[in-house]
Amino acid sequence: MNNSGNQNINKKVFLQAKYFFLARLLQVIIVFGILILFSLRLSKENYGLYQGSWVFINLFAPLLFLGLPQQLLTLPGNGAISHFFWLLKKYFPYYVTAVLIFITTLFFLHQKFSIALLICIFICTLFQSVMLLMDNLVIKLNADLLFLKQNFLYSLLFLALHYAWLYAETDMEWLVVGIAFIGFLKSAAYFLFIRKLNLGVHLEVADTLYFEKQWKLLSLNEILNRFTTHADKLAIIFLLSISGFSVYYNGTYELPFFAMLVSALGNSLSVQLSNNNTGAKSAAALFKQSIVTGSSVAFPLFFFFYIFSTPVFQFFFNGKYMDSVPLFFFSIFIAFLRVLIFAVFLQVFKNNHTILFGSIIDLLVNIGSVVILYPFLGIDAFPAGFVIGTAFQIAYYIYKTKKLINAGIRDLIPLTWLLALIVALTLFYSLLFFILQPLQTWAIIGIAAIITTAIIYLLTHFFGSKINNKKTVTSLEHE
């Protein structure tokens, strides 16, 4: 592919990533704000019920359609709808089985959650699952502005619903049903849009054996990933009281800023690389560029939240959840690893079996680490095991990606940039914490947050952009 072609892809990738980022930004801010508000206003028991409900919704909503939502992003651009309906019809019995497994899982929680709340969780999960499916389908159809508008409207309704529920002081069931309803409204709007399009629903599906194989691999991988991500919280719900779970949840809450950034870059890369005949070296250069961009945002945020973790918990939770800080020390390290989105690269180049095996490694190492560390760390072993398992998974992905495109690690990862950034930020934030320590908590957080924002701006608009342009152009010229 020539330089102009790759430059067009680069521009489209990061323009689309901007839409994804903006679409998620308001929702992330609102969810984070609700977490803070509910932590302060609700009892630990009620807060645990609320977040426990979301654990099951977030775990099972992507699993009810198994690997279909993620596979939508890699289907052929001119036949996404026909492939979607073909997969939906062919594997309908599997989706029904997933629903039955979900119902069985909820049944074992009747001693900690009321039957009425469990029914509401089930209904909400169904609507959230459909919403996720429609979200990815709209992304695949490149309806970026519609995606942005609908997510903006959904976020506002989500906030209004929580605000009304908090001041109405009614049962948790009403809140969960309300979330299900606004999810239904969003999905209905997407459906009406797609229905108006002439997309060749009845086009013949080519290479059915390939798509069947990919669906199976993605389904297994989705199950493993979701279980690995939420297994610790499931275990804590059964092991501890609901109040104890609320402490664990706040300590291991994965800051949405990291997930949002990775999701935006990952979805955009997946869509653009699958829609264009991009060579391996060009894709590697684009991938390397995304790591520089991602680390320019994620690393300053990591050091801010890690170095200033105690003041952060004191300020936002008013000292109520200080028991969560030791858990946070372990779980925050996942931010370093999230930037390395090798699974996206492997998926685009049809290596889903590698992704699946990496997920198996992640799960086994995670469980093994928890078993080994639990006698020494207690419940802190759960977030530590999660980070260790993810590290082994990414190491495996790096090894397989190098073999796939016959490239060195420096062709994929900007090692010099990452190392220099880590050292510089470690020294800077350590010094900043020492300087700000005598101040009041609100002043410490405010000043550190402003400085972190400035650092991110400088990295993304000056240093990161220069490295991106230089490395990407050089790589493409030698292709």
Where are these regions (language model features)?
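N-terminal membrane topogenesis motif
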Residues: 1-30, 71-73, 81, 145, ...
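Signature of the first transmembrane helix
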Residues: 9-69, 158-159, 179, 183, ...
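Membrane-water interface segments that mark the loop-to-transmembrane alpha-helix transition
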Residues: 15-28, 53-116, 280-301, 358, ...
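Interhelical loop/hinge segments that connect adjacent transmembrane helices in multipass membrane
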Residues: 1-9, 13, 119, 145-150, ...
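Membrane-interface junctions at transmembrane-helix termini in multi-pass inner-membrane proteins
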Residues: 74-81, 127-150, 332-361
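Transmembrane alpha-helical segments of multi-pass transport proteins
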Residues: 97, 101-108, 116, 168, ...
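Hydrophobic alpha-helical transmembrane segments
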Residues: 148-196, 360-368, 379-402, 444-456
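Helix-loop junctions and terminal segments of transmembrane helices
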Residues: 31, 35, 62-80, 140, ...
